[in-house]
Amino acid sequence: MHGIAASQPYVIAFFLLWAGLMKLLSRRMRAQAGRTALARLSGPARAVPALRLVGLGELAVAAALLLPPLHLLDAVAAALLSAGFLVYLAYASVAAPASSCGCLGTHSRPVDVRAFARAGLLLAAALLTALGTRPAAPGAGAPGTVTGVQAGLEAGVKAGVKAADGLAAPVPAVIVLEVIVLLALSAELDRYWLTPLRRLLVRLRRPLAAPPQERVPLEASLHLLRRSPAYCSAAAGLTSDVLETWDEDGMRFVVYGARDRTAVFAVPLSGDDPGAVRVALVAEPPLSGSPA
Amino acid sequence: MRSRRDVLRSAVLGGGAGVVAATAMGSLGPEAAFAAQKTAQKVEPGAPDPDFAEGRIRSIKDNTLLVLGSNLVFHTIRVVDGTSLWKLGPVPFDAARPGDGLYARGVRMPDGMLAAESVWLNIVNIRGHIKNIAGQTLRLDHNGHEVLCHVVPGKSVAIHSESPPTADLSMLKVSQHVQILGAWRPDTNEVDIATVFSPH
Amino acid sequence: MARSKATDPPADLLGPVQGEVSWFCCGTAWGPCSSTGKGACGTCNSGSLQHAWPNTSDACWSITRPDRCGVSLSRRTCGYRHRVTALCSGASVVTAIADCGPQTDLFCGERSCCGATCADNRLIDLTPAAYSQIASLSSGLRPVEISSA
């Protein structure tokens, strides 16, 4: 458990470095800054500077976490940043539900439950770091004060540590699992693993490979009809959508209203020649009928 | 019905009685229509079209649909024999249900009623990325909202640009961008597919 | 994806340009449309004679990118009027810009035909009220000619 707590700064720093560098260096991300919820918060004109500012903050906290010695303040800053992410996500989902979060990279999807889960996990990691970090001794540098609350929490953590030690959890496995979960919760990476995985499953299972239909779908006939010279010659006079269709002798008949007349088309059920479609205008008012 | 269909069938296949040839209609050709476009449009561009209505059916009485527009304006829409109704394809009047969304085009009468020429029930035309394909459904990411699109055997087709439409939708791929024209299932995020337009 | 160099000057500057038209909903609406909003101009409504144009601003152009399909289009802002004419029927409608769209580059090279006439690439989107003046909503996609009104 000590190992897990000790490794959390690196896990958090990894994600903060990723987020900060993307915000500062990715031209595409800056181009899409206007479509993030941050733009709603800061105003579209200040979206890019705001993105850079957040990126700098993330890099600063990441550097503080990575550079020894690890100070309680570093962990508290990481926890505050993670809590800030959660507040920002809540704001985004309410105020700009269609906007993307602009967190770790470019994607157009709005904030969803995965983004909350990732930010929550990072917050938990930061809290674990804070609780596992011994405050600096007075006179050894920056001040660090252990409050009663923190002392209580530390006691809790120690109790937890003892319990966990009893379970002899394989620390590296837990850390790897944590990183995998955090990566899996990152929608920014979906195109590298989730989309190919889904494509592979579709290729293997072929879910939409329907058995050949005996009946030609009406939309297929209508598409051929709309491409036909016959339709062109009569389209300007049509006043309704399809009123009635039926199949007879290898043809599909399609009836439209044409003001006070009826336009009837004959579309071959086989073949793909728009020139084979025929039309006639019948001098009788259209009657709606049941579709075939 | 049979005899009427016979009349229409013989008209289009063999020149039966009562047929008016397209050329004899004069004004039906595209050239005439291109010329006619010079005439002024009744409705100011950008303004609401009084001959068009949008909303959800509140109630149905005889041949009249009482529709509450999404902008909270009521429309009374009269459906007559020559009115086409679409709900994943042409349907009879009794397919219309309270709760259905609709678009309607017709002629606005002096009493405010819309005499409908065409009514499209629950029609949606949405674009998005295919998130996943499973069973007979596509999960579409439409503006960040997931729409569950059902393939309807015998009705749904895919159109890959210039290729003829096909009932085989297995060419669709996860993450590709498509346009789906279909019928919304009221009060759900689900749509029955009429046509999937795929650029490739 | 058929990508080629954009035409220069804008294809629609000297005369009508041909392309595909589809329809989109906006404003207060039902179903999956209810989350759409009033569009980039803040005025878009499904029941009004309006359209979406791919070049209403720099931000809009960066999303739609018709140049990736080899088409350059003029910058036209909210309220600008275009006439859209169905290529075969000749039916036309004049509409005002109310939104940014369509995302031309996602459908690069797509072609729609009517008779012997074809048009490539999605260059304009009409509201249901406008689209249903020149074609049936159930057709979904039609070849058209676009000109300034």
Regions found by a protein language model. Give the residues of each.
Chain C
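Secreted/periplasmic proteins
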Residues: 2-149
